[in-house]
Regions:
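Residues forming the flavin
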Residues: 1-117, 121-141, 145-167
Length: 167
């Protein structure tokens, strides 16, 4: 992980590395082992589903719920109140330019949720083992690889929208 610590006046660039040390090589006393946080395995149901699971909303949680279901072999149906991202961008831009507000398609409703119009900063919970899975998934769908090592991961809205469409 990369981070910058400027809390105590001076700026300190910090890097945490995972390394393997050969036998016989003494580790320095200030080296600390890194605990790898593995995402828990998802338990699969045992009963066959008669219908596809339904996910309500295509915001971050809805997209990831649908993606996880699809990876497990289900065919989820995602219901979203707003429009697909390309149409949503046009509708929101029209509103920003002084046009009419669309109660069905706006900054809050549509593919990507409210985050599709944010600055692209990711609030990741460092202690949550699923956090790494989320970042890896975003990187697999076109987010910059740097988010995997940044302490404060940042995609940027211009890059976030194609990632959402890819998912």
């Amino acid at each position: 992980k990369q981070s910058i610590d400027a809390r105590k006046g001076g700026v300190c660039f910090q890097v945490a590395l995972a390394v393997s040390v050969r036998r016989g090589v003494k580790a320095r006393p200030d080296w600390k082992p890194i605990e790898e946080k593995k995402a828990p395995a998802f338990a699969l149901g045992t009963k066959r589903m008669q219908n596809s699971p339904v996910v309500i909303g295509a915001g971050p949680c809805g997209l990831f719920a649908a993606l996880m279901l699809a990876r497990q072999g289900y065919a989820p149906v995602v219901l979203e109140r707003g429009s697909a991202l390309a149409q949503r961008q046009r509708t929101v831009q029209t509103f920003f330019d002084g046009g009419a507000f669309d109660p069905q398609c706006n900054v809050l409703f549509g593919d990507g949720g409210a985050g599709a119009f944010s600055d692209g900063k990711l609030t990741s919970r460092g202690k949550d083992p699923l956090g790494r899975l989320v970042l890896e998934t975003l990187a697999q769908h076109g987010a910059p690889q740097e988010i995997l090592i940044q302490n404060k991961a940042h995609i940027g809205t211009d890059r976030l929208r194609p990632v959402i469409e890819s998912i």
